Regions:
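Bacterial N-terminal signal peptides that target proteins for export
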Residues: 2-17
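C-terminal motif of bacterial Sec signal peptides marking the signal peptidase cleavage site
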Residues: 24-27
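Residue-level hotspots at or immediately adjacent to binding/recognition sites across diverse folds
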Residues: 29-437
């Protein structure tokens, strides 16, 4: 059984690459090498866009917070009987709250009783290697402020226990990969004082927990996401400085970066190069970053990112579009691009050789299914009024439930604005059952 390193978020695609690659993808130009350094074929094929298809069902609400001023920001699913979610609540969004699923229902959990330092933690991550080993990572103050309050804790099956912080904790927790109580990788970083396309050394740092202390490891490039199937098969993705923007600008364009850990060390894997959309304007002022990685096997890895390129109107600056690519063990192949595809995050495998995004599913046959919104929640009157019908579902996290064709999402359902007394925001967990899964 493959271990998903991020709370069972990224693995379990179960051979998605072979199926999707044949029907969806376009080989990228440029020479790349596989994980063993071999030079593969660089055969190109015609680009494909996802074809429209019937709707893929709707999100179902599995949990809704009692508080009407709350939202969930992180989710980890160790199994279909063990899951955690973390969010913020309160008039000033000053309370961090935990909820736990035991296979029957979601219950509030008083994590503050276990973690006295728990306060307002707007930047949070959850990751798990299985029941009895779920990790929580939280940063208190907004990015770039002083006196950052951070908390790292581990659920051991009975309570949350504090874990020491890395010796030089930065102001942003990005992502984490958990393989066991004594094998955890943590990405941190900073966004203060950066020039475009240039990054401080903190952006190339990953911390490794060995059970007793954190070890600082320098990565070959900046990383924004990390995930893996096993302790000796881990991927990190992000960006690296590319060509200089122009002679008058010190910054450099961002280029995609992919890194692999084989149990001995980290090394760069030549990253995919994305073709600009057909509606892109002239010029080579293009950049791309990888925002997430979904590994399912040595020859089955998805990366998701964002590409910036000149728009058709030079006066309006650059446009952006999501990008996908698949690693088949020897080369990257560019995935489909379409206005139907949503942004790069959140994303999860669907257990049926496809990917699930916020509002749709990319199937193995290349078709795109729209996922409808969840049912309407009653507002503050206890009914669904005209005001309440404007409510929106926002998702911060998507996770495939291990060994199933279900994807769970965490976020909020909210309505209102402008200070209305009818405003509400409920933290929610929603479920999507993959059709035919």
């Amino acid at each position: 059984m493959a271990i998903d390193s991020r709370g069972r978020k990224a693995a379990r695609v179960a051979g998605a690459g072979a199926a999707l690659c044949l029907t969806l993808l376009t080989a990228c130009g440029g020479q790349v090498r596989d994980a063993d350094g071999r030079t593969p074929s660089t055969t190109r094929s015609k680009a494909a866009s996802p074809s429209p298809s019937a709707k893929g069902g709707a999100w179902k609400i599995a949990y809704s917070s009692k508080a009407d001023n709350a939202e969930l920001r992180a989710l980890s699913v160790a199994s279909d009987r063990d899951a955690w979610a973390v969010g913020l609540a309160g008039d000033d969004w000053d309370k961090t709250f935990f909820v736990h699923y035991d296979g029957r229902q979601w219950r509030d959990y008083d994590a503050a009783a276990d973690l006295p330092k728990l306060g307002r933690l707007p930047l949070v991550e959850l990751a798990s290697s299985g029941p009895g080993n779920t990790w929580f990572f939280g940063t208190g103050n907004p990015v770039g402020t002083q006196d950052v309050a951070s908390v790292i804790a581990r659920w051991d099956g009975s309570r949350w226990r504090d874990v020491p912080l890395p010796p030089r904790m930065t102001d942003q927790i990005k992502d984490a990969a958990v393989f066991g109580p004594d094998d955890v990788w943590l990405l941190t970083g900073t966004q203060a004082g950066e020039l475009p396309g240039q990054w401080p050394v903190e952006e190339q740092t990953v911390w490794h927990w060995t059970g007793a202390h954190w070890t600082e490891v320098r990565l070959p490039a900046r990383a924004d996401a990390i995930a893996g199937r096993a302790p000796d098969d881990i991927w990190a993705v992000g960006s690296a400085p590319g060509a200089q923007v122009d002679n008058n600008t010190p910054g450099r364009r961002a280029t995609p970066a992919a890194m692999h850990y084989d149990g001995r060390g980290w090394r760069l894997v030549p990253a995919p190069q994305f073709q600009p959309p057909v509606n892109a304007g002239p010029g080579d002022d293009r950049s791309a970053v990888l925002n997430d990685v979904v590994p399912a096997g040595p020859d089955d890895v998805w990366v998701i990112g964002t590409q910036s390129y000149p728009g058709d109107d030079p006066d309006e600056g650059q446009d952006e579009a999501p990008v996908l690519a698949h690693w088949d063990g020897s080369r990257w192949e560019e995935g489909p691009t379409s206005d139907q595809l949503p942004g790069p995050r959140p994303v999860a495998p669907d257990g049926a050789h496809g990917l699930v995004f916020r509002w749709g599913r990319l199937r193995a046959d290349g078709t795109y299914e729209k996922i409808d919104k969840s049912p309407l929640l009653p507002g503050k009157t206890g009914q669904v009024t005209k005001f309440d019908r404007a409510q929106q579902l926002a998702l911060s996290e998507l996770v495939q439930v291990p060994d199933t064709h279900e994807v769970w999402g965490a976020g909020s359902i909210a309505a209102g604005g402008g200070g209305s007394e009818l405003n509400f925001s409920h933290g929610v967990v929603v479920v999507h059952e993959v059709p035919g899964g």
